[in-house]
Amino acid sequence: LDAELIERAQGGDREAFGQLVSRHYDFVHATAWRWSGSSTDADDIAQEVCVKLGAVIRSFRGASRFRTWLYTLTLNAARDHRRKLAREEQTFRAYAAEPQQDAPAGNDDELSSELWAAVRALPERQCDAVLLVYGEGLSHSAAADVMGCSEATVSWQVHEARKRLKTVLGKEEV
């Protein structure tokens, strides 16, 4: 069904494009949420992906599965959004009189939030690998397809991320 909708959307059929977006929106939003940790940011990222999809649908050639290609679009949009937020945060901190300190984590939900926040603070490639493998449940091979690298590179990025998270969080098991 996707193949037919893609072909029609590539030909300019707006109804087919709308159906394609509807079929995959929840996937895009869930992926965006996993990367951002915020439903508001996920809404923004998903909207950006839908707009971008309209501009680039004609470039999809079927070399990979559509969902893998869409994953890559979402990943890139999430990265761009994260960079934008980092720039805004820098600007805010430059003008803020006293930055607020986060409250310490106390329960399991807060620990989980602390862990995912630490994951999102990792270097970009490590963050991507961890979110794809642990957040999205992809195999190292599937994560490598999305990231455009080898399976060994994904394994190494995950290993390095785990070491860094153990240090940052002060935990034996991460």
Q: What residues fall within each predicted segment?
A:
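DNA-recognition helix of helix-turn-helix
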Residues: 75, 79, 126, 135, ...
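Internal acidic/polar
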Residues: 2, 80, 88-112, 116-117, ...
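Hydrophobic positions on the alpha-helical face of helix-turn-helix-like DNA-binding modules
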Residues: 49, 73, 130, 143-144, ...
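Structural recognition of an alpha-helix C-terminal capping motif at a helix-to-coil junction
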Residues: 30, 44-51, 55, 64-76
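Short amphipathic alpha helix immediately N-terminal
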Residues: 21, 121-142, 146, 171
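Short, charged helix-capping/linker segments at alpha-helix termini
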Residues: 10-19, 29-48, 59, 141, ...
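Arg/Lys-rich amphipathic alpha helix in sigma70-family domain 2
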Residues: 55-62, 72-93, 108, 160
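Short amphipathic alpha-helical boundary/capping segments
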Residues: 4-8, 114-123
